[in-house]
Amino acid sequence: MAAPAPRPLVIDTHWLLDLWLFHDPRAQALDTALAEGQVRWLACAAMRDELARVLDYPALQRAREARGLGADAVLARFDQHACLQPHPPASPWRCRDPDDQVFIDLAWAHQAHLLSRDRAVLALAAGMGRSGLLVSADWPARPSS
């Protein structure tokens, strides 16, 4: 019997920073899941562009320098693990933060679990959940409400 296909997952920028810049222990299980192919992380070019942009924020530049980590190393991890998708069509939900909209739209387009620590995204979790989408701030997933 074939192994089940890894479940699709959309990961926001906050989580990526916790994974690869801050090495937050709460992100360790996700890092393992990505490395072992337990999830299929879906992303698009706009998400990579946002990560590149925020890595250049002064506070994050200092954090990278303190860890001896270049932006290119973080972006290489993105490129290694992300399954790039075309830019998604608009979903039924509108996020207060336009930078976060693409994460919602991609999750909707692929019926993927959306992993986010962003308040504007999490504020939409209940409505998205009623449409069958799992939105959570935690990994392993616990639905946000």
Label every model-predicted segment.
Residues 1-43:
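Short, well-structured N-terminal submotif of metal-dependent ribonuclease cores
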Residues 15-16, 47, 120-121:
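Alpha-helix capping/helix-boundary segments
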Residues 17-20, 64, 89-96:
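Short, flexible loop segments at the rims of nucleotide/cofactor-binding pockets, characterized by
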Residues 19-20, 54, 63, 124-125:
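Residues that scaffold the ATP/ADP-binding catalytic core of kinase and kinase-like folds
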Residues 25, 42, 69, 94-101:
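Residues at secondary-structure transition points
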Residues 26-29, 59, 131-133:
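Glycine-rich, phosphate-binding/catalytic loops in enzymes
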Residues 32-90:
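PIN-domain endoribonuclease scaffold, especially VapC-family toxins
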Residues 97, 101-104, 108-115, 119-145:
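Acidic, PIN/NYN-like endoribonuclease modules and their adjacent C-terminal/linker elements
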